[in-house]
Amino acid sequence: MLANLDRYKIVLASNSPRRKELMTGLGVDYVVKTLPDVDESYPDTLQGEEIPLFIAREKAAAYQSMIGPEELLITADTIVWHEGKALGKPVGRQDAIEMLRSLSGKSHQVITGVCLTTREWQKCFAAVTDVRFAILDEDEIAYYVDHYQPMDKAGSYGVQEWIGFVGVESISGSYFNVMGLPIQKLYRELKQL
C-alpha cells in the first residue's frame, strides 16, 4: 500500500517493543537503530503536545549524523498529560503507584509527538487521545505495578495490559496512540510523502 516508500529505507529509532509491534502491523519494512542515552529532558516552559514534539525532534537530532542518503528516520515520544503536567516514565515503584493513584477516576490525555526525518527535510506531528480511568483501589494499583511492567511506560501504564482491561473506562481518539504510536496518523503521513 505504501509503494511510495520504496525509495526509502525506513529506520525506527526506538527501543519500544510496542512501537516495533505497531510498525510491523503496518506492514512496512523497517530496521531499528537505537542510541544508548538520548536526552529526553525538555524546557519547563513547554506545555502539552509541545513536550513530545520537542523530544521527538531532539531524538531525530541525535540520530542526524547516522541518517543515510536513502533513509527515512521515525522518532517518537509519548507523554501522559494530566492536570497541567506531563507524566513520563516512572522512576521507581512508588512513583508508578503515585502516578496511577493520580489517574484513578479521572481523565487524562496521551500525547505522542512523531518526527519523520531525512537528510533533506523533517515533518513532525502530534496525536492526542483522551483516556478516562475508572476508580482503582490500592490493591489493584499495587497488583499492576508488581506484576506488569509500568516502568517503561509514560504514565506508568500500558493500555494493552491488565490495567487497561480493568481500569480504562473510555478512550476518545487513537487506541494505538495510547500504546505509543498513532499508527493510523503515521500511515496517512507516510502515504503523503
From Swiss-Prot:
Cofactor(s) of this protein: a divalent metal cation
Q: Which UniProt keywords apply?
A: Cytoplasm, Hydrolase, Nucleotide metabolism
What CDD domains does UniProt report for this protein, alphabetically? Answer: Maf (cd00555)
Q: What is the lineage of its organism?
A: Bacteria, Pseudomonadati, Bacteroidota, Bacteroidia, Bacteroidales
Superkingdom of the organism of origin = Bacteria
Enzyme Commission number, as recorded? 3.6.1.9
Q: Name one GO molecular function term.
A: UTP diphosphatase activity
Q: Where is this site: Important for substrate specificity?
A: R18, T78, Q160
Q: Which InterPro entries match?
A: ITPase-like_fam, Maf-like
Its annotated function is as follows:
Nucleoside triphosphate pyrophosphatase that hydrolyzes dTTP and UTP. May have a dual role in cell division arrest and in preventing the incorporation of modified nucleotides into cellular nucleic acids.
Q: What class of enzyme is it?
A: hydrolase
Q: Tell whether Hydrolase is among the UniProt keywords.
A: yes
Taken from the UniProt entry, a GO cellular component term is: cytoplasm
The record's subcellular location field reads: Cytoplasm
Any one of the GO BP annotations: nucleotide metabolic process
Reactions catalysed: dTTP + H2O = dTMP + diphosphate + H(+); UTP + H2O = UMP + diphosphate + H(+)
What NCBIfam families is this protein classified in? maf
Q: Per the record's keyword annotation, is Hydrolase included, yes or no?
A: yes
- What protein does this entry describe? dTTP/UTP pyrophosphatase
Q: What is its main location?
A: cytoplasm
| Family as reported in the entry's similarity comment | Belongs to the Maf family. YhdE subfamily.
The active site of this protein is located at D77 (proton acceptor)
